[in-house]
Amino acid sequence: MGRFFNVNIEFNRDKVNEIIFSAILNKRKGYICSIESNNLSIANINPEYNRIINGSLVNICDGSVLAKILAWIHQQNFDSYIGADLFLSFIELRTFKQYFLGNTQEILDSLRENLAKIDPAIETMRFCPLPFADVENFDYLAIAQDINANQPDIVWVSLGAPKQEIFMHKLLPYLEQGVMFGFGAIFNFNACVGSVKRAPKWMLRWRLEWLYRAYEEPRKNIPRYVRFLCLLPRLVWQEYQTLRQQRRLTP
């Protein structure tokens, strides 16, 4: 896992899966972050949040534009590993005991129904909504006690960035086992109810999901994109400086 724009990211999908499987099989606990323009920007503004992001087991690149920018800088074949795709790949394995945490009861009920069509065992797995609260005000001990009682291999967390990454970091000390994934809107995408939906397939093929997100939730996403674009020149310059230093040190 390399450090790009001051954040740890693993671009090798096989390596990502290897880290996750190893943690699950060895009953390790930890969390996985999905890096895109929003949480990358926050990680470059907030040092504590940066520490949380870089304290994960592994981070994936959930932004196709971000992957292209870094591929251009480093002249390597970097590609994104979209959280929604990783989520479905693990559901389709029909192997692990899972726990679904966060979002609303309506979303969770529909999510259970849809995922159970892929893996019938999911019908009896735990789906737990969370109240709307500041990340400092959750009862982490009580949440962890319910998770520990179920002993899941995987805990999917749907709170949205940056809240979900901070939440996972705070919950981690109370867990006995389980790999947490903070993947935001994947519950909404797969529940197929509510206002938040995944982009049409043609937009996914052309790596335009970011544009669909801006159209779908402009008040939320356009300011995030603007913040990232304002930070981008400095990040690119710093990345080039780091790359030059590495090349000078390489025999």
Region locations from a protein language model:
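A transmembrane-helix-recognition feature enriched in membrane-embedded lipid enzymes
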Residues: 67-68, 198-251
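A short helix->loop->beta-strand "cap" motif at the edges of active sites that frequently abuts
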Residues: 29, 96, 175-179
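Proline-aspartate-enriched helix->loop->beta-strand connector
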Residues: 147, 151-161, 177
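Short Gly/Thr/Asp-enriched flexible loops that form oxyanion-binding sites at enzyme active sites
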Residues: 112, 165-174
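Short, flexible loop segments at boundaries between secondary-structure elements
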Residues: 130-135, 176-214
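Short glycine-rich anion-binding loops that position phosphate/pyrophosphate groups of nucleotides
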Residues: 37-40, 159-164, 185-186
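N-terminal nucleotide/polyanion-binding subdomain common to many enzyme families
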Residues: 1-79, 84-85
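Conserved beta-alpha
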Residues: 67-146, 150-151
